[in-house]
């Protein structure tokens, strides 16, 4: 099993979208790569913790490759916009690819470079090693499964 953490704006939609993909074994939403230990949702929303809303993904690479997973990720975000996805604005809504395995970096860089060909503006999606990931409060986990009418900036139809 492989792991990756993806930030694509509001984590509810990213988790729901990713959880529907064949080969995804587990998803959790949380707060990635900030400076405050174990922040609350309210603290992250204040913009003072440096965390991105993100989705931890465990996947079976015999079913889906990292390259395929990243292609799906690129399809649900606008990687050229800083600190905004859909109607959501703030540093916590920035896009990012946070890797746990250094060996994944070449695939990520190649994927980002390939995706850049689709845009005139530069891609601003962060590519960083995962420094920290704090699981979000329980009510955020599988939020759109529990609340199918909930807000989502990603088209899930």
UniProtKB/Swiss-Prot annotation:
Q: Which InterPro entries match?
A: Met_Sox_Rdtase_MsrA_dom, Met_Sox_Rdtase_MsrA_sf, MsrA_MetSO_reductase
The protein's superkingdom reads Bacteria
One Gene Ontology term from the biological process aspect of the record: protein modification process
Q: Catalyses which reaction?
A: L-methionyl-[protein] + [thioredoxin]-disulfide + H2O = L-methionyl-(S)-S-oxide-[protein] + [thioredoxin]-dithiol; [thioredoxin]-disulfide + L-methionine + H2O = L-methionine (S)-S-oxide + [thioredoxin]-dithiol
> Which parts of the chain span the membrane according to its record?
none
Which controlled-vocabulary keywords does the entry list? Oxidoreductase
What's the EC number here? Answer: 1.8.4.11
* The protein's role, per its UniProt record: Has an important function as a repair enzyme for proteins that have been inactivated by oxidation. Catalyzes the reversible oxidation-reduction of methionine sulfoxide in proteins to methionine.
Protein name, as recorded: Peptide methionine sulfoxide reductase MsrA
Native organism is: Clostridium botulinum (strain Langeland / NCTC 10281 / Type F)
**What gene is this protein a product of?**
msrA
């Amino acid at each position: 099993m492989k792991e990756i953490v993806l930030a694509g704006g509001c984590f509810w939609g990213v988790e729901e979208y990713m959880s529907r993909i064949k080969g995804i074994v587990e998803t959790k939403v949380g707060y990635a790569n900030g400076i405050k230990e174990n922040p609350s949702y309210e603290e992250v929303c204040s913009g003072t913790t440096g965390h991105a809303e993100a989705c931890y993904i465990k996947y079976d690479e015999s079913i889906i490759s990292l390259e395929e997973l990243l292609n799906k990720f690129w399809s649900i975000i606008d990687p050229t916009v800083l600190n905004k996805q859909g109607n959501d604005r703030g540093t916590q809504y920035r896009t990012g690819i946070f890797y746990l395995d250094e060996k994944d970096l070449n695939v990520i860089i190649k994927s980002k470079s390939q995706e850049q060909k689709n845009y005139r503006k530069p891609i601003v999606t962060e590519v960083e090693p995962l420094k920290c990931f704090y699981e979000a409060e329980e009510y955020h986990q599988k939020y759109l499964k529990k609340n199918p009418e909930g807000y989502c900036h990603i088209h899930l139809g």
